[in-house]
Amino acid sequence: MAAKDVVFGGEARARMVEGVNILANAVKVTLGPKGRNVVLERSFGAPTVTKDGVSVAKEIELKDKLQNMGAQMVKEVASKTSDNAGDGTTTATVLAQAIVREGMKYVAAGMNPMDLKRGIDKAVVSLVEQLKKQSKPTTTSKEIAQVGTISANSDDDVGQIIASAMDKVGKEGVITVEDGKSLNNELDVVEGMQFDRGYLSPYFINNPEKQSAVLDNPFVLLYDKKISNIRDLLPTLEQVAKSGRPLLIIAEEVEGEALATLVVNTIRGILKVVAVKAPGFGDRRKAMLEDIAILTGGKVIAEEVGLTLEKVTLADLGQAKRVEVGKENTTIIDGAGAAGDIEARVKQVRVQIEEATSDYDREKLQERVAKLAGGVAVIKVGAATEVEMKEKKARVEDALHATRAAVEEGIVAGGGVALLRAKQAAGAIKGDNADQDAGIKLILRAIEEPLRIIVTNAGDEASVVVNAVLAGKGNYGYNAANGTYGDMIEMGILDPTKVTRTALQNAASVAALMLTTEAMVAESPKDDAPAGGMPGGMGGMGGMGMDM
């Protein structure tokens, strides 16, 4: 086991604070409408240019082990805030730095760090309460666009495209971000339910231009096993042929003789059929088949519920207005399922989302809700170069998370104003002793920091602006983009409540841990081996002069 260095007291905290400052100073240059970019080296390819706080924080590793520990703890603040709220990473980092800086003064003056921590916790609970009181729900598309714009570093176009995506697929809908092919951002909306399985044979194609199979007003057969014997399918095919309508078959697999017969019948024009593999795997496949059954008003033909292929009637089949099957995707538009059944299914899946333990499961369940509830929107990000594309895509994803957070918990005035108003509304928070009072005081001082940094990055005098904003009331604040004062919400400068709340809670939590640190343990730096001279055994090389 490698030898360890143990550092105590003031020296340990001082080294940790150095690390905090290095990371926070690199991150905070990106804050506000006039924040600057940070360029990140890549081991191969072009460097990445970003204005996203968490991307900068994640890149930072310091050589000094103790400094690095401080930096990593603040990095944790940024990534936790990003995971929970999707945005506000720079605000969280700036708050953490300010709390540590103010707190270290009190610790150095001999105050009890544990009481300081208790004071910090009391102040945060009170401030969060005030933020919730200030919060107002997002109702209009305009507000959603404004939240997106602010989060995307004042890019209007991004805010608008996210708002129109939410308009089209609903606030619960799935919105994904992809690389675009042109210079401009584009929005594609897929209505109905889409899943990532295409036709099993290209002979099913009936729309050569789009290379897809389109079925109008089809029946939908859902089967949870393989179909390889055509005899099992014959009764269903005969009933569908009599009705004169097309048929979509979704099964675990359609193969061999069954697939060949379906293809031959389609080519001859006897029956219009398309066969598709069922989406998902294992239990998720069963759940998705059940979703499609509810959406189309049909049943999943499964032996465990006593249904077999031979006994299927038209009443067991689902129906839809239109189905489009491409090489890789199938879209069911306007299924015939009852609205009440679909709503009940959505509620059931939402309960599962709340109980889900892994992010992956939660994401998949949310996709299912969206597919049942409305549709899927794809934002295609356009840019001139790959470097710009990466930077823009990261901003669009941030903005999307921020708008989701705004829909979830509402909005407050942006530009650091909400925290100042929370401080004023909280009034006199009292601790149990003088040291706790100091902890409360340091938080109330530290929450001015986001506004100070926004103003500093815009090239103005921070103290003057903070005092002017504190003298105002309500949403009155400072618009750093053009140097004017006014109502932040009217000017469209909004922050999601969840983002501001999460940033404050995470920053205070980690900063309080740093203040209560008394010892640090890190691996001792390895001594470099002395450089060796030339290896021996090279003597006897004299007398090599040449007589000319």
From Swiss-Prot:
Keywords: ATP-binding, Chaperone, Cytoplasm, Isomerase, Nucleotide-binding. CDD domains: GroEL (cd03344). It comes from the Bacteria. It catalyses: ATP + H2O + a folded polypeptide = ADP + phosphate + an unfolded polypeptide. ATP binds at residues 30-33, 51, 87-91, 415, 479-481, 495. Disulfide bonds: none annotated. One of its GO terms (molecular function) is isomerase activity. Its EC number is 5.6.1.7. Pfam families: Cpn60_TCP1. HAMAP family: CH60. Belongs to the chaperonin (HSP60) family. NCBIfam families: GroEL, PRK00013.1, PRK12849.1, PRK12850.1, PRK12851.1. This is Chaperonin GroEL. The lineage of its organism: Bacteria, Pseudomonadati, Pseudomonadota, Betaproteobacteria, Burkholderiales.
